[in-house]
Amino acid sequence: MNKELIEYFKNDELAANVWLSKYAQNGETHPDQMHSRMAKEFAKIEYHYQEIEHETGDWIEKLSKYGKVRNDLTEETIYELFKDFKYIVPQGSIMSTLGTDLIASLSNCWVAESPLDSYAGIHKTDGDLIYYYKRRGGVGIDISNLRPSNTFTNNTAKSSTGAVSFMNRFSNTTREVAMNGRRGALMISMDVNHPDIMDFIKIKRDLTQVTGANISIKLNNSFMKAVENNGDYILRFPCDSSEFIFALDNLNYNELYKGTGNTYIKKIRAKEYWDEIIKSAKEYAEPGLMYWDNMLNNDPAAVYEQYRPICSNPCGEQFLNANDSCRLMAVNLFSFVLNPFTEEAKLDFSNIYKVFYEALRLGDNLVDLEAEYIDRIIEKIKSDPESNEIKQQELNLWIKSKEKCLAGRRVGLGITALGDMLAALNFKYDSDEALEIIKAVMQTKMEAELDCTIDLAILRGHFEGWNPDYEFQVAGDDMNGYVMVGGNNQFYEMLSTDFQIQSKKMYNYGRRNINWSTVAPTGSVSILTQTSSGVEPLFMPYYMRRKKINPNEVGVRVDFTDQNGDKWQEFAVLHPKFKDWMMSWDISTHVGMKNFEDLNQNDLKTLFEVSPWYQSTANDIDWKKRVEIQAILQKYTTNAISSTINLPSTVTYEEVSNIYMYGWKAGLKGQTVYVDGSRSGVLVSTDTKPQNSSFEYKDAIKRPKELDGEMFITVANGQKYKVIIGSIDSKPYEVFASLYVEEDGKPRKGKIIKEKKNLYNFYSSGEVLYVTADMTDEEAIITRLASMSLRHGANIKFLVEQLNKSNGNITSFGKAVARILKKYIPEGEASTLKCEDCGSTNVVFEEGCSKCKSCGKSACG
């Protein structure tokens, strides 16, 4: 790897490797070359439209305020927007394919036609998957229209094996075509109305089943209300049959579907099925949940039959119609922070508006570029030596895909680095101030996007089939003027109240794009931008890697010797923005005069605790705040969001159920939770060391009069507590907790001194705090038992697990103490999973995907 590339990424070898292995083409050795390659292609489309726009001038006064005064984009200005991954980052296939001679699609995701209810239909869908995968991209299919098991068929079998029986066929096709560098990813969805839904819910409990696909259930409001009310629910096939046409009192439940227009119905208890959904989600991380009515009510495309979504892409952020596709781009939010990590830090809202306006314009250009690349695919198919009979299905697929692409002109404009943006502004991720700033950013973003897509409709024409009366309700007429009354779904209703100027212009002139924004996974993108990923909080700002020491090396620091006698050196890998923060601060006041490479784990822990990421990492965030943040993001996002709520392994089924219910009520379109360890059967466990079978009692070492102590502030059951941990040799020895009433809520270090029996004081910065007062008997028992366990040598990891097994909810006292103690689990013990590619245990789960922080492997790209 060349030195210049390493220097470009500020010595971040992971970023350099990801770019070189995934995106460099045609001998490229530097990202500037890739950015120039892409800018040239975008500019080609831009110049074409500018010629048309400049021929007439009567459109100027119709444009938005910014649209009237902006300068035309050039190849140079487009390049500057891409350069250094600072503002706009085209995702995945766009970076690797645009401007090359590869015969591939620029789209990141597709939804295929649902399989027809016949073997021929199923076979055709299988073929469609193959043809999409071979040109890159993930695909979603909905199998709700395949008949239930044991229903009548007009063949020698006489009865169907059911919709679920074909899932492995589609999954195996995905795994097959994903080999040798070709990229396959699959989402299979099923309507909760389907009589086979229980088999669908349970199928991935068998870890050998459907291993090549994500699965999700389409949940409607009627089912969710039946769960809430512990009521009955009617499964039916066809799934879109209306209950109201059934004379339910006069029909025999479970009557077989005859294939003649009759309906197969089945009466169930909704809560029983919901409990099975929660069990699978908690223990196996699937199925995901799609809140289908929420999606339809908040999707601008859903009021149009020809664009109404039928399924989502594999990561769940793009709901699409059959043969529809989307091309993704992400905007780096960190770049809008002026004076990051200082008291003067603030957002440049003017620049946010401009960049999102221009980004959407580039996204529209990308639609035309995709049409060109599909033409190349079509010409390649036509020139292939196979007979027309063999080629016809693939040819038809790409012709329909091009037509759908140009008709709706979908754009998938997203964001990344939200977590780092908040840290740079000195906000905790889930603070009230953070929620307010997120809302302000999203409103500015939406205003820019609306202005752009309406301006583009004026300049270039609206999407095919636009009809203002499908979208808005108005009173009055053109002669006397009209008043915007509201929208025909919740999305247009929101526009008519929150963006009144844009709504009226959209009613008059239309818009260019049927749908235009999303929040997609940005695993590889965030490695290149060197920021937090998507809208997720940072997982951790540092982690430790071990490097094996060559026996011939001399004078090398040895940090660890394993059971085989091999010597290892530990070194820190710093999150790039954490490193930027350290460079902007005088870290010597906390860890002394040290170079970054000399920082040990204790140094990093000390710095982390005074950084803006402290108590704002993925495992620190209260799940209700995560849902509230996602709801704000969703309100101002036209499609959906890929995001994951991380939960401890001891979370209860009831808590998982509450999280999903809360998300549905908050208006989310889809939701994913990841319970720590729930995919341990899928990923490879590294915990293979034999356990000592002997049992011994162990006496506690004598307590010194004085211990090093750390005080943390936490909330349990609505009360604020100070939790003080006493340590010997940096290992926890005892735990105290009591009510905290002071204003200053910052953690601090000091000394715990035993004054006399049952009287301990905490001395910090000249202040004395009592540590054994104001606790209930239950709270005192918890801390005493925790202290006794630590003093007698219990592994802190198992103590945390036991505290988390209490029946209380996530905010109970025992679990609040566990959250503090978890910070003391030694590096390397927190994760028992390892990456299938590089073997690292630095595996996290975010944005719906497992990701390796060591090599960059991500299921979502």
Regions found by a protein language model. Give the residues of each.
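Extended catalytic cores of very large enzyme megasubunits
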Residues: 1-794, 798-806, 844-846, 857
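Domain-level detector for trafficking modules
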Residues: 807-823
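Short, flexible, mixed-charge glycine/proline-rich loop motifs
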Residues: 823-832, 841-846
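Cys/His-enriched microdomains
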Residues: 833-836, 850
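Short, cysteine/histidine-rich loop/knuckle motifs that typically chelate Zn2+
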Residues: 836-840, 854
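Short cysteine/histidine-rich zinc-coordinating motifs and their immediately flanking basic loops
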Residues: 846-852
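Short metal-binding segments enriched for Cys and/or His
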Residues: 859-861
